[in-house]
């Protein structure tokens, strides 16, 4: 039986193969790099998918260390709860003593005292529970405020603020003493509670004054006095140098 096979390559294909530098062999075997032996070395589809998406398998396995760390940070310790509770008790005990000290020494009706104690008890419970609930918030706020206020200070400014508070407290106690001698214990209770309230308020006010208005009159006098005392051993030139150095410093240099 004669073979009627005709080649699929035409004269045009042969010319194109000669121009390209190689001849297209349509009758031969496939190229060597695509034989069946090397097909087995190619990675499978599952290997390609796992190598392309390694995060999905890692995310499926739970990390117990992360869960334990988050659980430990979210659950408050007994030490912090005890500190929070005791601090709020001390703070509102002081508040209750001051408020009750302003009201109880005077003559009031029985109905007024009952109404006052009920209203005061409700307000105290609300403030006490709110202070415990927002303990971390307002303590962080106070720390941030004190850091911003005290950081640009030198020691002289802090000492001046507390000296002003001490003088103010001494003035209140002197007035209280004279009022007790003149009119009895009635005005003594008033001035005592007033001094208990105004002392921390005045301390905060003086510190704010020193932070907003640096080198107020009394602070400037105090710093010049300290510079004069330090310059006693060095003579007049040392005093002038210290005075000029203090006047030339800006608030930005105090940080």
UniProtKB/Swiss-Prot annotation:
Compartments in which it is found: Spore membrane
Bias (Polar residues) ranges: 41-60, 67-78
Short name of one Pfam family: WTF
GO cellular component, one term: cytoplasm
Membrane topology term: Multi-pass membrane protein
Entry keyword set: Membrane, Transmembrane, Transmembrane helix
Domain of life: Eukaryota
Membrane-crossing residue ranges in chain numbering: 85-105, 112-132, 162-182, 187-208
UniProt note: phenotype after gene disruption: Simultaneous knockout of wtf14 results in normal vegetative cell population growth. Simultaneous knockout of wtf14, wtf11 and wtf7 results in normal spore viability.
A single GO BP: meiotic drive
Region: Disordered, residue numbers: 19-78
Free-text function comment from the UniProt entry: May act in meiotic drive.
Other noteworthy facts: Although the gene is capable of encoding two isoforms, RNA sequencing data show no evidence of alternative transcripts.
Family statement: Belongs to the WTF family.
Protein name in the entry: Wtf element wtf15
């Amino acid at each position: 039986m004669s073979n009627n096979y005709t080649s699929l390559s035409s004269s045009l294909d042969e010319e194109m193969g000669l121009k390209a530098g190689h001849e297209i062999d349509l009758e031969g075997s496939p190229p060597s790099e695509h034989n069946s032996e090397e097909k087995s070395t190619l990675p499978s589809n599952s290997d390609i998918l796992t190598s392309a998406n390694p995060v999905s398998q890692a995310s499926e396995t739970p990390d117990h260390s992360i869960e334990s760390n988050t659980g430990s940070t979210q659950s408050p310790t007994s030490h912090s709860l005890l500190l929070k509770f005791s601090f709020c008790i001390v703070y509102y005990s002081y508040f209750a003593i001051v408020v009750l000290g302003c009201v109880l020494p005077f003559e009031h009706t029985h109905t007024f005292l009952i109404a006052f104690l009920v209203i005061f008890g409700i307000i105290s419970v609300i403030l006490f529970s709110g202070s415990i609930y927002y303990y971390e918030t307002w303590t962080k706020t106070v720390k941030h405020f004190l850091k911003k206020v005290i950081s640009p200070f030198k020691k002289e400014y802090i000492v001046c603020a507390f000296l002003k508070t001490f003088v103010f407290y001494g003035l209140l106690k002197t007035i209280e003493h004279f009022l007790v001698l003149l009119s009895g214990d009635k005005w003594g209770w008033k001035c005592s509670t007033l001094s208990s309230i105004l002392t921390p308020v005045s301390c905060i006010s003086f510190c704010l004054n020193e932070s907003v208005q640096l080198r107020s009159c009394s602070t400037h006098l105090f710093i010049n006095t300290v510079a004069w005392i330090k310059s006693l051993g060095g003579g007049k030139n040392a005093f002038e140098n210290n005075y000029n150095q203090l006047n030339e410093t800006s608030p930005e240099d105090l940080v």
